[in-house]
Amino acid sequence: MTAFSEILQRRDWENPQSVNIHCLKAHSPLASFRDMAHARDGIHAQRQSLNGQWKFKLFDAPEQVDGQFTQADFNDAEWDEIPVPSNWQLHGYDKPIYANIKYPFDVNPPFVPRENPTGCYRTRVSLSPEDLLNTQRIIFDGVNSAFHLWCNGTWVGYSQDSRLPAEFDLTSHLVAGENTLAVMVMRWCDGSYLEDQDMWWLSGIFRDVTLLSKPQHCIEDVFITPDLDACYRDGSLSIVTTIAAPETYQVQVQLFEGTQAVTEPNIDRPHNRRIDERGTWNDVVFQTLHLREPKKWTAETPNLYRLVVSLLDENGTHLESEAYPVGFRKVEISEGQLKLNGKPLLIRGVNRHEHHPELGHVMTEEDMIRDICLMKQYNFNAVRTAHYPNHPRWYELCDQYGLYVCDEANIETHGMQPMSRLSSDPQWAHAYMSRYTQMVLRDKNHPSIIIWSLGNESGHGSNHNAMYAWSKNFDPSRPVQYEGGGSNTTATDIIAPMYARVNTLIADEAVPKWPIKKWISLPNETRPLILCEYAHAMGNSLGSFDEYWAAFREFPRLQGGFIWDWVDQGLSQWDENGQHFWAYGGDFGDEINDRQFCINGLIFPDRTVHPTLQEAKYCQRMITVSLQEQTQKACTLLVTNENLFRATDNEQLNWSLLENGQVIQTGSLALSVEADSQTRLEIALNFTPKAQAQYHLNTDICLIEATSWAPAGHVVATEQMALRNHAGLAIPTLRTQPAPKLTQDGHAIVVSSLDEKHQWRWDSQSGLLMEWNVDGKAQMLAAPQDNFFRAPLDNDIGISEVDNVDPNAWVCRWEMAGIGQWERHCVHCDSETLAHTVVVTTTFAYHFGGDVQAITQWTHTLSNDGEMLLDVDVTLADTLPPMPRIGLELQLPLYQADTPITWQGLGPFENYPDRLAAARFGLHTQTLAQMHTPYIFPTDSGLRCGTQWLQVNELAISGDFQFSVSQYAQQQLAEAKHTHDLLAQERIYLRLDHQHMGVGGDDSWSPSVHKEFQLTEKHYRYQLRFKPASR
């Protein structure tokens, strides 16, 4: 018996050689069905969940734990209770820590802080005498970071690697009746140096705990390898079964589709294959099944069979069965491309952390299904388990629903210097190998897994080479990818860079990131390129995403990538007023933190979607539509089906014809396009074109019937095509109305319509339009003013670490130029009456640091009918950096909380100049609240581009502009750190932009806005026409 004091003295949690003690060898998940039919149907598994309320107490360090807590008779009545699974930091113990790169403790591997929060758990399990006739194994699917286990006061063993199962044989420790389990979990261990992923540091038993009952003679492991013949028609299944039984026992394998057997039973014994010059295995059975023309598994067609593996004694009596879903598919790299079933894949992927806003790292099945359905609804076909093996159920669901998986080992040493320090250290080789091999051994039977990953951001060293070599020997059916060390080392079958650009080199003397187009053309480089991370979706981001997809579709060896990342890692918190907000790094008093750098998702923590997800859905669409030919009476469309393995047998094309953004004709067409092919469709048009009207054809590809992941009617792909107007031009009408009345009263310039219905008043000293009344009702609450500032986006701030601010970041450059702090002076303000209008001209100079930074001239042309034509001329100093925006801001009255905003332009969702591929021109209406995107870290949001007409309240504006509306002042948005810091104002801020800089998004730590979306010109001119909406 190992004494508690000996365990404390031994300090397994600071020894990289002590990865696990007394753990059973890793294997595919086991269920121990006692009947073949039960195995086939997946019912009555011999697994007992130990999830529930456990006794719990947190200590400051292992040395402070009372070793008597391991004993069955220990009095835990005063202890708290905590749910298992859970993270203890989310139940009032200790605090969450978020860091991207930095370790939250002093770096001195393998040692960890002496102040090492230690959670002690206790629970009781009752077993009958009949239960003890079988072996009893306990399985911890995930414990962070390391733990010791006792049963009835006896030490059982130790394990670390928080993302893989730890399984112990409890049989010899159990008694009939009540049994006591005690677990001591350390927050930090030497393994923490290998788990420096960009996520929350949370602790505890956070995945399921299960008791597995198996007979004395049983199946220990099953390794299934599907294959297809050279024509990808017929299938074979290699089955390698490891047993704990006499050599005379037999293994039977049989394949089912539903309840129907599709192969005959195949029965064999150990010693049936010679391995080397010393002979055969005495506990391994090799078998092969063949199936003619099986239904193939792909993400598009996730056809599954079920393999039942049974152990029979020498008399043929059934003892136990295990069963696994089987997907017939073949993964290979040939001709420089990653292929599935002979077809080159295009990876529409995303990196996904296991994150829940209330449960932390605990994921329920419902959460997993919701993520998968959202991914498929938004045209993702692949997921990278960033950066660790996921919950076992995740892979079963990916098999079932259809997602390609890049399964990643729980290894990241991002905070080491150099990053490869541990990766090149032989003392850590065992820890590396254990993490990788146990992942592969657990997950090897899942058809959804098409790529193994050696880990993330750990440099490149001999330990990676060892993992790669083992993988290629153990499972040659799957490629291996790894980004570290430059993305193209000998330890990867796929060039797998992070954040490489399409056309721009990111220079680094150690690990240069070539433009992806160039990378595949480097000398002697024949591998496919799949970005393991790209398009950093932090806040208001994903600019120029369409540029990647144009490259992916143009160059066959550019095979897509995995967006970073899926979900904002915000944790639910409430302020002192009971207002909810999403917390990020530093919000829990965690002094080492990287603030909001964990808020990188395409969706919010509660799974509502960001506008960026619309852009991803559009660019990744599986079915594209393009206009091939147009006459006055018809349009010919080319429909391309990028699905590689299924025809459009459950889709229809709904179309609508728009005139000036309004629908005037609709229709539907049956859609029948074979996989990976094209067809032409003709749409008959029945309308008379109007002079100078704009016409667009919208197409929506919709599901006819519901699928497992989306309801009937779900739109899988959209398109909008501009049509030519076959009508002639309209003759313009000339104004014949008299000019309005101009008067001056001291410093006031007053312009009124002859019927006194419309009135404008300027202050000639400030040059500002102070009042605009219609029928005595104020149209504005504050004067329109030049607007050059935007509340900085995460990409503008450009940091990945709190103490690593880049002076070249946009926000730093803007602050240096004083943008948002300029002092305005009116140079002059003039007015004159013309034949039909009154013109008021004001000139402003903007000063900062003793210099004039900008000069603007506003020319207001006022008509008797209440119309105001505003012409703005902007000149900027040559010394200024690219500007955030060129435009103006007004403040309007707020009459109702759900004020409708109607516009003719791109929408309906938020779009920016470099993120508008998915937006469509039309006449849109949304409420004021819908026009604001509540980014967790408040920033500029809600822009709509390509606008020609806008109505807010009783004011209509026309021109060619971009706009946003909000109840928050820009300074509020710039200063707020969370949404609960924002107090909605009793007014509407209307921002009208002539030009607005792009949002960027190739990454979030460098100025990533592409040149064509930067405002580098020094002269701008624009016009806006204002009029009462009632006209």
Curated annotation (Swiss-Prot):
GO biological process, one term: lactose catabolic process
Protein name per UniProt: Beta-galactosidase
Binding site for Mg(2+) 1: E412, H414, E457
Enzyme Commission no: 3.2.1.23
Transmembrane portions of the chain: none
Cofactor remark: Binds 2 magnesium ions per monomer. Binds 1 sodium ion per monomer.
Subunit record text: Homotetramer.
Gene name for this UniProt entry: lacZ
